[in-house]
Amino acid sequence: MSQPPAAHVPVLYTQVLEGLQVTENGTYLDGTFGRGGHARGVLEHLGPGGRLLVMDKDPEAIAVAEHTFGGDARVSIHRGSFAGLGQVVAAATVDGILLDLGVSSPQLDVAGRGFSFGKDGPLDMRMDPDSGQSAAGWLAQATDREIADVLWTYGEERQSRRIARAIVARRGEQPLLRTAQLADLIASVMPRGDSKTHPATRSFQAIRIHINRELADLEAGLDAALGALKPGGRLAVISFHSLEDRIVKQFMARYAKAPPSNRRLPEAQPFVPTLQLVSGAIKADDSELAVNPRARSAVLRVAEKLGMENRESGMGKGHGAAASRFPTPDSRFPTSPNGDAP
């Protein structure tokens, strides 16, 4: 299997294409185009009758897509979140869908996007810079409790309250407008430790997830993807942290496995699976990590939508599964051992 251009190295490239099982005349959707590494691989396997739809809410990614694939009649380009993919494709019409979650390497590498604590730039963090509130805008008006809740819920930051109090105190003296300002402030209030991870890592992740509604979009996108897939179609999702992966894993399991039965409850309708798990968690091997260290935290999961005949053969007793809920800052979490987290 050919490799993508060296200029951009998409994570788990070969595993994604194998998981999607791209066919010559199939219809595929890349819900997170980025710089098009996976999309190029799909196109290499499509014939003249194949079709590729690409989506991204980042205007820079859309510009790359139009420049790279604008002349290819097989490609349709749409700006927007994959949460709205149901508005782009009709139900049961797609053979494969890829969602490559989180922030892209180009977004991290450009200081002006405000995602990285390692590169000083405006404190923005929006994947769509034309929509919503920037990180600086939110931090300027959120209460210390709201900030602490976000840091704990989306970053699992044990020092969430301490950091939130420091942010509120500092903004009273001067506005927080730069990534370096925020990173230095967080580092100044964190306990000294031996961790090689930058002290602002969890906080930056949490604020970014909140600003972009990433987990809400993920749940909406998974539901939309299930409806858009044909029977036999494949859903491939790459996640980069435990919150994302938990949602993906639970979503796939909810539609693939009957929930545990309870002898004390009356017998329910038979459970009818909608998905079949193609793989467990797939991670990058050492050879990929040597070329692309950012793949270290990537986890790929693949599931296949079942046709009615396969669904009936997989029927089992069950009581149905309650709809999963992504974590929100309003959720109540246990207090951390140091008593600092909300």
Curated annotation (Swiss-Prot):
Record has Transferase as a keyword: yes
Similarity section: Belongs to the methyltransferase superfamily. RsmH family.
A GO cellular component entry from the record: cytoplasm
Pfam families: Methyltransf_5
Chief localization: cytoplasm
Subcellular location: Cytoplasm
Binding-site positions, S-adenosyl-L-methionine: G36, G37, H38, D56, F82, D100, Q107
Protein name in UniProt: Ribosomal RNA small subunit methyltransferase H
Function: Specifically methylates the N4 position of cytidine in position 1402 (C1402) of 16S rRNA.
GO annotation terms (biological process): rRNA base methylation
InterPro entries xrefs: RsmH, SAM-dep_MeTrfase_MraW_recog, SAM-dependent_MTases_sf
Record region (Disordered): 309-342
MF terms (GO), sorted A to Z: rRNA (cytosine-N4-)-methyltransferase activity
Keywords noted in UniProt: Cytoplasm, Methyltransferase, rRNA processing, S-adenosyl-L-methionine, Transferase
Source superkingdom: Bacteria
E.C. no: 2.1.1.199
Compositionally biased spans, kind Polar residues: 333-342
The protein's enzyme class: transferase
Substrates-to-products reaction catalysed: cytidine(1402) in 16S rRNA + S-adenosyl-L-methionine = N(4)-methylcytidine(1402) in 16S rRNA + S-adenosyl-L-homocysteine + H(+)
